[in-house]
Every structure is written in C-alpha cells, then in structure tokens.
C-alpha cells in the first residue's frame, strides 16, 4: 500500500473547464508550496493540474473522465496508467454530491474543444453525459469491490468515495458491505 498523510488544508474538487488553466495552475502551485493536495474534480487530470508538481487527489465520477471507453464505461488500462503517475497520491470516487443527488449532468458539445476532449477521453464537439449512477458497479458491495479494484490498479494508493445520502439506511448498507468484504 501507499498511504498518504493528508493535510488538514487541501483544495476541494474543481475541474479544468469549470476553472481556467491559470486558476488550476495557481491552485496546484499553492498545493505544492503548502504541502497539501489538490483535488482535480471529475473532469480528469489536465496538464495544468500537473504543471507545478502539487500532490493530486484524482476524482472520478460517473462519466469516468480520463479513464473511459468510447461508450462511457470504465477503462481499467487508462485508469491504471493515470492513477500510477507519481503526482497522483490518492483517488476519490464521486458517487453523488449534495447539489444534485441522484442526477447526472451534461457537458454541451460546444464546450468540448480538442483539449477538453483529450483530457476527458471524449469526442470533440459532442455532448457528453455524466449518468446519474456508475456503470462499473451496483449496490454497496459492488461499490466496495470497485474501490478495492481501484486501489489494486493504482498500485496500492488510497481510494475513498464521496457521496450525499438521503437516509441512514444507505450509509449503514455501505458500512455493512465494508465489514463483510473486509475492505476499509
């Protein structure tokens, strides 16, 4: 395993595209100087995230940007190659977020230029959907098994998940799966 001791101060998830290259570079430079991590957001790892050498938390959402097949499903080989970069210190699997629990998203094709297409592994000029749920797994046990697979493919880096839940039952089901599968 490759444990990572995170600072109490880190940079929250914000994708390149939502923020400019200058903003991403400045945030990553700050992470390098401050010795804390910079979360990429679900848009993938851009050259601007790695330019200054700050530690990265690579966030992977339902669109699997930067590690997807043409049909939008998870691509293990692309994930393995990106996750094993030295600068990527940990991985965050985004299940849902408070602003839009249970909803996907859509990036209009007009915003998918050559650079965005390359970073996200999508087609230039085409609308890109982020489904409301992951296609790589189903249910709590599927989630925990997928987390373990991501950990193994990354060479033992820490893998966590981000979620917004509507009931305690959902959270307890994930905890039960972790205990049953002995994946922590």
Give the location of each predicted region.
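Active-site entrance/lid segments in N-terminal catalytic domains of soluble metabolic enzymes
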Residues: 1-184
């Amino acid at each position: 395993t490759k444990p990572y001791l995170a600072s109490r101060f880190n940079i929250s998830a914000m994708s390149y595209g939502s923020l400019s290259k200058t903003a991403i570079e400045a945030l990553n430079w700050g992470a390098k100087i401050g010795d804390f991590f910079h979360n990429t957001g679900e848009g993938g790892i851009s050259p601007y995230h790695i330019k200054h050498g700050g530690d990265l938390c690579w966030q992977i959402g339902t669109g699997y940007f930067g590690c997807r097949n043409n049909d939008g499903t998870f691509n293990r080989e692309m994930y393995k190659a990106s996750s094993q970069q030295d600068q990527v210190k940990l991985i965050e699997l985004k299940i849902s977020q408070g602003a839009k629990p249970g909803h996907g998203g859509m990036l209009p094709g007009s915003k998918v230029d050559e650079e965005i297409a390359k970073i996200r592994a999508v087609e230039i000029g085409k609308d890109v959907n982020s489904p409301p749920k992951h296609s790589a797994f189903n249910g709590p046990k599927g989630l925990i098994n997928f987390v373990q697979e991501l950990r193994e493919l990354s060479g033992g880096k820490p893998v966590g998940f981000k979620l917004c839940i509507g009931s305690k039952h959902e959270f307890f089901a994930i905890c039960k799966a972790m205990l049953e599968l002995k994946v922590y």
